Amino acid sequence: MATLHVDVVSAEEAIFSGEAKFVVLPGESGELGILPGHTPLISRIRPGTVKIVRADEGEENIFVAGGILEVQPGSVTVLSDTAIRAADLDEARALAAREKAEEALRNAKDREDIAAVEAELAMLAAQALAARRLRPGRGSH
């Protein structure tokens, strides 16, 4: 079966680089499924989970806090400020950070601060949801 090369890169490190049969990720207008030979595409992505079905049938799940997607017929590149492997997600930590952000929202004084905190809240909510869904024993529904 044909494969495509997938790179998921955060501001800090390369999170995944390898061959895959299929990639699913949260596009700006909904979920995107990418197969080998896909039409070239550049798009923003929303916070959520990137699911990679590796060439060996294994699966990688990576939380991204939004970013940019580039698709070429033989490759997929995901660039995100924050990308976290599913095994490293911590729902309790994300919920605690969300509580702090909600407090910051209550104290925000201007539109710029409010917009920044609302974006952070959306990312933290997506991170907590991804952690809950990808928790060992739950599967990736």
UniProtKB/Swiss-Prot annotation:
Asked if the keyword Cell membrane belongs to this entry, the reply reads yes
> Main location per UniProt?
membrane
Compartments, record wording: Cell inner membrane
- Keywords recorded for this protein, A-Z: ATP synthesis, Cell inner membrane, Cell membrane, CF(1), Hydrogen ion transport, Ion transport, Membrane, Transport
Which protein family is named in the record? Belongs to the ATPase epsilon chain family.
Q: What does this protein do?
A: Produces ATP from ADP in the presence of a proton gradient across the membrane.
What is the protein named? ATP synthase epsilon chain
Q: Which organism is it from?
A: Bordetella avium (strain 197N)
